[in-house]
Amino acid sequence: MRQKRAKSYRKQLLVYSHTFKFREPYQVLVDNQLVLECNNSNFNLPSGLKRTLQADVKVMITQCCIQALYETRNDGAINLAKQFERRRCNHSFKDPKSPAECIESVVNISGANKHRYVVASQDIDLRRKLRTVPGVPLIHLTRSVMVMEPLSTASAKASKITEEQKLYKGLNDPNIEKLQESGDGSGKESITKKRKLGPKAPNPLSVKKKKKVNSPSDEVKDKEDTSKEKKKRRRRKHKSNTNVPVSNGTTAAQ
């Protein structure tokens, strides 16, 4: 993958993770057409998805897509699909839905991607329908190159609304004035209320140190200490020199 494309994919995934709460490992729903295409072109589907999303993935397939693969009797594609986790779609085995209808019913729940699926499909009509659902990353294979589609209009609009709500949350809230007047009920003042500033203390480095004033008791103690020190001092004794010569040339008697 080229560096420019990888950087673009990282930006898109950041939007999906911040706005729509996508988390690793990403759950990727694949359809029968993509499995057949990967099997025919010898494309490693799990590693391709991991390389495109730049994270760990959990590849999943619905029961209706498996039923569609059984009808093709392509053993290679069937064995490849059996390696993936089976996603229950709650559709009957006897009367399965088409893969496109099945995936759309699993992903689009009341107009939202509730389970945060990444859809990898070769069905153009299915991808067109899922672009109207906010927060659905779409992946397809083009000439043996796995491509993730740019952010859809619905996803970009939902992301913009979410960011604006985060930015202006609380500023336009009508209950803010009431909270400022009455408080929040617990005795605490509102967060937006300004804190009163008192007089500033002087710079401790520019203030002169106070002179220590000795009390009479301290002076008496100092005098006692000095007198004790004087008493403890010893007087050095000088030894007399017995070998001092006398004027007549004899030494003094010891």
Swiss-Prot record:
Ranges annotated as biased composition (Polar residues): 241-254
Any one annotated GO CC term: nucleolus
Protein origin, superkingdom: Eukaryota
Listed Basic residues bias regions: 229-240
UniProt keyword Iron, yes or no: no
Biased composition (Basic and acidic residues): 175-192, 218-228
Main location: mitochondrion
Keyword set includes Chaperone: no
One GO process term, biological-process aspect: endonucleolytic cleavage in 5'-ETS of tricistronic rRNA transcript (SSU-rRNA, 5.8S rRNA, LSU-rRNA)
Localisation per UniProt entry: Mitochondrion; Nucleus, Nucleolus
Region entry Disordered, spans: 172-254
Keywords noted in UniProt: Mitochondrion, Nucleus, Phosphoprotein, Ribosome biogenesis, RNA-binding, rRNA processing
Molecular function in Gene Ontology: small ribosomal subunit rRNA binding
InterPro entries per record: Fcf1/Utp23, PIN-like_dom_sf
Note: Present with 6960 molecules/cell in log phase SD medium.
Function recorded in the entry: Involved in rRNA-processing and ribosome biogenesis.
Descriptive protein name: rRNA-processing protein UTP23
Species in which this protein is naturally found: Saccharomyces cerevisiae (strain ATCC 204508 / S288c)
Gene field: UTP23
